[in-house]
């Protein structure tokens, strides 16, 4: 690759680094082209799975202000640039690696933190944002239902007490 081509690749990678919400690094040695295509399809439209030279990835990451990826850039490395829900992308990579042993998750970068392989795999165990929001909404609804029951129970209890007193007075008379 000639220098102008390398500069163009670095510029593209730098742009991807700057626009990504998260980055995962994987070793793809042993994966076939159809397997890589399948992985790209599973990752979805908001995620790109890019194979590039480690030196170019290293330069682009530094230009984008991301430090600490050097240790992870050894051997054949593919970079997964994620826009949006990076937890879901981590789950997709983890599940794909389970069925395709050739894919090895090396680590990642999300929310300003560099993760090693174990850290990146732990991200896959977290609940996604939509799941957390659904649980939160369910908790709020349950709390509101309990409050409505309690507010309704007070007048009902008062009415029952008054009824019991009235019946007691009628029997006494």
UniProtKB/Swiss-Prot annotation:
For this record, the Gene Ontology CC terms, alphabetical, are:
large ribosomal subunit
Question: What does the sequence similarity comment in the record state about its family?
Answer: Belongs to the universal ribosomal protein uL10 family.
Q: How does it assemble?
A: Part of the ribosomal stalk of the 50S ribosomal subunit. The N-terminus interacts with L11 and the large rRNA to form the base of the stalk. The C-terminus forms an elongated spine to which L12 dimers bind in a sequential fashion forming a multimeric L10(L12)X complex.
The record's Gene Ontology biological-process terms are: translation
Instruction: Please give one Gene Ontology molecular function term for this protein.
Output: large ribosomal subunit rRNA binding
Q: Which UniProt keywords apply?
A: Ribonucleoprotein, Ribosomal protein, RNA-binding, rRNA-binding
Under NCBIfam families, the record lists: PRK00099.1-1
Q: Which gene encodes it?
A: rplJ
Q: What does this protein do?
A: Forms part of the ribosomal stalk, playing a central role in the interaction of the ribosome with GTP-bound translation factors.
Task: Please report the organism this UniProt entry assigns to the protein.
Answer: Bifidobacterium adolescentis (strain ATCC 15703 / DSM 20083 / NCTC 11814 / E194a)
This chain belongs to the protein called: Large ribosomal subunit protein uL10
